[in-house]
């Protein structure tokens, strides 16, 4: 068995609730990401051998917690190579996703991948989130290692509509690596919930990574 096939078997053990159709689409996405990453640095090239079990697994941990109703609207800020936005759009076809980045070449790549994956529930926008109108448009705003928690919170807090028909309630879902306590202490932000991803999937060896939910 080759290393790639072994990685997918491991992922299926970690996320057994995902359908075969979803896995096939996720495989197509990683193939496209590798294709583009050889031309444009979207993901650290030293991580490409562990793309599935490190970066994709990190994003897929959201599926352990996120239960959303049809037509939910989600914004992925600083999407880079489409993480976590594209995997989430694949896993939640009933929802509407906006993937946003300020760097033109990354937006071009993500647009290409969305088109080739035929993700009709996904739009891609170039720009900075703080320049968006102050409209409470989205049920959730997603981010992964974009900036510090206080800065991200200030950027997106006025973009989230109040509501509790989803689980968790509407708000910010931020994938954070490293210690977060000092950032929360100095900013006086109070998350609704913090999940340790290493405790959730110790076999994944994700390290000191967390999913932090702010209810708005």
Task: List each language-model region with its residue ranges.
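Class I SAM-dependent transferase core
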Residues: 1-70, 75, 105, 111-122
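Conserved SAM/SAH cofactor-binding pocket of Class I
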Residues: 60-143, 153
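Class I S-adenosylmethionine-dependent transferase superfamily signal
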Residues: 88, 156-163
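Short "lid" loop at the C-terminus of a central beta-strand within the Rossmann-like core
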Residues: 130, 148, 176-181
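A short, conserved alpha-helix within the catalytic core of class I
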Residues: 148-158
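Conserved beta-strand signature within the Rossmann-like core of class I S-adenosyl-L-methionine
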Residues: 164-179
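Active-site capping/gating segments
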Residues: 177-216
């Amino acid at each position: 068995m080759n290393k790639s096939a072994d990685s997918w078997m491991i992922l299926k053990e970690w996320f057994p609730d995902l359908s075969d159709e979803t896995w096939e689409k996720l495989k197509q996405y990683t193939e496209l990401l590798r294709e583009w990453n050889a031309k444009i640095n979207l993901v650290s090239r030293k991580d490409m051998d562990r793309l599935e079990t490190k970066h994709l697994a990190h994003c897929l941990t959201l599926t352990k917690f996120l239960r959303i109703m049809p037509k939910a609207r989600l914004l992925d800020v600083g999407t880079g190579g489409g993480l976590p936005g594209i995997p989430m759009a694949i896993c939640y076809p009933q929802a509407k996703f906006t993937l946003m980045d300020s760097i033109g070449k990354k937006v071009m790549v993500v647009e290409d991948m969305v088109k080739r994956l035929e993700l009709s529930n996904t739009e891609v926008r170039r720009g900075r989130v703080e320049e968006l109108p102050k409209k409470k448009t989205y049920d959730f705003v997603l981010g992964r290692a974009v900036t510090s928690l206080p800065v991200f919170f200030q950027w997106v807090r006025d973009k989230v509509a109040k509501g509790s028909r989803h689980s968790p309630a509407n708000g910010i879902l931020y994938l954070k690596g490293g210690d977060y306590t000092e950032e929360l202490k100095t900013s006086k932000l109070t998350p609704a919930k913090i999940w340790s991803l290493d405790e959730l999937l110790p076999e994944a060896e994700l390290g000191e990574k967390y999913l932090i939910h702010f209810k708005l």
